[in-house]
């Protein structure tokens, strides 16, 4: 999932 949406991943996993 992180690979498909790196933006959301960064926002949740900064």
Swiss-Prot record:
Please identify the protein, giving its name as recorded. Unknown protein 6 from 2D-PAGE
Query: What induces this one?
Result: By elevated hydrostatic pressure.
Originating organism: Fructilactobacillus sanfranciscensis
The note filed under miscellaneous reads:
On the 2D-gel the determined MW of this unknown protein is: 65 kDa.
């Amino acid at each position: 999932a992180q690979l498909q949406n790196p933006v959301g991943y960064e926002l949740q996993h900064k």
